[in-house]
Amino acid sequence: MNLDIYQKLCSESKILWTQHCLQRMQERDISRADVKNGIATGEIIEDYPDDYPYPSCLIFGYNVNGRILYIVAGCDNINIYIITAYYPDTKKF
């Protein structure tokens, strides 16, 4: 998947959020603005072309305060579907 389509759809606010995703984001203190910024500043680090119902990817980006943020999202070229967003465990690196 091409990051350009994610960034275009993000700039057009064509993002769909599940209740589960929003709940987990709240638990992790991640805002919608953080996710949008992560997509805008990000790069795709893993691609999942066979995911169902839409191809998805892992995006490495930054929240609005410059903290590293990972976003898993799918795309049907009409909307972005946010699957989850989380701060990586930097102790593993």
Please place each PLM-identified region on the residue numbering.
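Ribonuclease/tRNase effector modules and their secretory precursors
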Residues: 1-93
